[in-house]
């Protein structure tokens, strides 16, 4: 398959329900903005890709992915969220379940709290994130096998410890920190907050 939705410049989702059940890259544009609605994507490459189209090459445009609200679930065989510029998540619930064959995961430059963890997930495994009081932050049934999980919701507070449960395995993770063995800023790395350059999840 090819891309699910593609725009040269701006792709904005303000509401409704969208399900890209099969694609190469599910959502692709220079600037991808999700403000509300329910968005679920499946892709053999990047889930959401912000990149500079040849038609805009002479305009010095800056790619960006911005999620301000809604419920976003991304299943990707490469990068879940791939911005060749800024990646910002300020609201809503975003979950990325990925294989991690590309440069993932990489974290938002600014925005609300998030957790990221390397996991071993089989299709149909129950995956959930709970806080220190065992209150559920997010829960889903994985629609595909995965090796990386990223979750951002308003309930997640940076610096707090959360528990990621995938199948029968549980792991503790601190919000706002890359998983052990994850990629940080630096030459050849995929960058953390403030590192500039591209942002991959």
Each predicted region: which residue ranges?
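A composition-driven surface/loop motif
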Residues: 1-201
